[in-house]
Amino acid sequence: MLVLLAFIIVFHITSAALLLVATIDNAWWVGEEFFADIWKVCVNNTNCTELNDSVQDFSTVQAVQATMILSTILCCIAFLIFLLQLFRLKQGERFVLTSIIQLMACLCVMIAASIYTDRRKDIHEKNEELYAQTSGGSFGYSFILAWVAFAFTFISGLMYLILRKRK
């Protein structure tokens, strides 16, 4: 039982770490001479421009930013609630509240990654002056980490739903 508990805790912390890196790091769209994410666009590693309301379709970028931040916060809250429930639940009860919050984090990261997947090309085309040198890029590791975090949070949310408290 102790090994299972340790695995669940490590799995959850890994999910939170993946979400943090995917949200913070500047590598959602990368190329040889540039990298761009949901916060800024950098060309030649020196010329960085923050994304602000002057960017067309900034509301789309803000939706991705907000849902990634929300997913990270929800994942951390789910972990704290899990620890609280670990000591408060009666024997045999399920970690339903933790599961619901973790699945909400999963939903948020899925929404963010899906919006970015769908709208990235439109944002780049509508803001040619900002994204002029980013046409030859590909999805970066932060984008991939967001999808991996989606899978991790989904699995952990299901794990919490199935899990019952034992002695």
Curated annotation (Swiss-Prot):
One of its GO terms (biological process) is T cell mediated cytotoxicity. Coiled coil: none annotated. Its main location: Golgi. It is a multi-pass membrane protein. Glycans are attached at N44, N47, N52. The keyword Nucleotide-binding does not apply. Functions as a key regulator of cell membrane composition by regulating protein surface expression. Also, plays a role in regulation of processes including cell migration, cell proliferation, cell contraction and cell adhesion. Regulates transepithelial migration of neutrophils into the alveolar lumen, potentially via mediation of cell surface expression of adhesion markers and lipid raft formation. Negatively regulates caveolae formation by reducing CAV1 expression and CAV1 amount by increasing lysosomal degradation. This is Epithelial membrane protein 2. It holds the Pfam family PMP22_Claudin. Belongs to the PMP-22/EMP/MP20 family. Keywords: Cell membrane, Cytoplasm, Glycoprotein, Golgi apparatus, Membrane, Nucleus, Transmembrane, Transmembrane helix. PROSITE patterns: PMP22_1, PMP22_2. It is found in: Golgi apparatus membrane; Cell membrane; Apical cell membrane; Membrane raft. InterPro entries: EMP-2, PMP-22/EMP/MP20-like, PMP22/EMP/MP20/Claudin, PMP22_EMP_MP20. GO terms for cellular component: apical part of cell; apical plasma membrane; cell surface; cytoplasm; Golgi apparatus; Golgi membrane; membrane raft; nucleus. The chain crosses the membrane at residues 1-21, 67-87, 95-115, 143-163. Interacts with PTK2; regulates PTK2 activation and localization. Interacts with ITGB3; regulates the levels of the heterodimer ITGA5-ITGB3 integrin surface expression. Interacts with P2RX7 (via C-terminus). Interacts with ITGB1; the interaction may be direct or indirect and ITGB1 has a heterodimer form.
